[in-house]
Amino acid sequence: PPRSTLFPYTTLFRSENNGVYGLTKGQFSATAEKGLELKKQGINPFLPVDIAMEALASNATFVARSFAGDPKQVKELLKIALAHNGIAVLDIVSPCVTFHNHENSFHSYSFGKSREEPLHEISFVPAREEITVEDFEEGTSREVTLHDGSTVILKKLEKDYDPQNRAQAFKMLAEAQMNNELVTGLIYINPDVINIFDMYNLPDEPLNRTKVEKMRPSPESINLVNSWMF
C-alpha cells in the first residue's frame, strides 16, 4: 500500500494472492494476468499489478514472495517479516483450486510447482538463541543482521543475488516477468531501517496497557512547561 509506506511503522502486509475474487464466483482480481480466461468473466484485458514491484516502488523496506506449495519457505519468510523493524510486504501466491487453478496460469498450483525459481534457501535465526551454522556442501552463504539482532542466513543457489540491492531487485522482478517465471524468496531487505518508534523515542509498551501514574506528568514537569509558555 503506497500511502502506508510513507510512515515507517513496524507493519506486515501479507497477501494471499490467487488472482481471483473467490467470494464473488471467480472475478478477476488486480493481480490476474492479462489474457487469463475464466468461465464467468471471459478474457482479462488488463495488465496485472505486481505486488512485490509495487512494494519496492513504495519504499517498503522488506519485500518477499513465496508460493503456498512451498510451506517451508513461507514459514521462514513469515518469521523474518514479523521480526523486521519497518514496513514488510509478503506476497504469497496461493492457488484457488475452485475458481482459478488453470494449468498455464501464474497463480495455479501446477505452474508454481513447475516454474518456481527460488532466489536462495532461507534460514531465520532469532536473537538471543544459540546460533549454529552447519557446513554447506555447495554454494556460499550471506548473513543479514536485522535491527533487533536477529540474523537471516541466505544460501545462494544458482543466482548471484543480493537482497540488500534495491536496484537489482527491480531488475530481477522485471526479468522474471518477461520470462514468465515465478521468482520466490527474499527480494529486498533494508536491515538498517529506523521506524517511527525510534524516530520519536516512543515506548514499546502499548498505551492502553501503560499505567496512569507513568503517563501523567509530575507537578514539577507541568510547572516547568508553564514557565516556558508564560
Give each language-model segment a name.
Residues 1-12:
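Short, small-residue-biased leader/transition segments that mark boundaries at the very start
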Residues 10-20:
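A glycine-rich helix N-cap at a beta->alpha junction
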Residues 18-23, 97-98:
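Short gly/pro/ser/thr-enriched loop/turn and capping motifs at secondary-structure boundaries
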Residues 23-35, 54:
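Active-site-proximal loop->helix
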Residues 27-32, 71, 79-83, 101-115:
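Short, surface-exposed, charged loop/turn segments at secondary-structure junctions
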Residues 35-81:
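Conserved thiamine diphosphate
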Residues 84, 88-91, 115-119:
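A conserved active-site cap/scaffold subdomain adjacent to cofactor or substrate pockets
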Residues 98-230:
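Flexible, low-complexity linker and terminal segments
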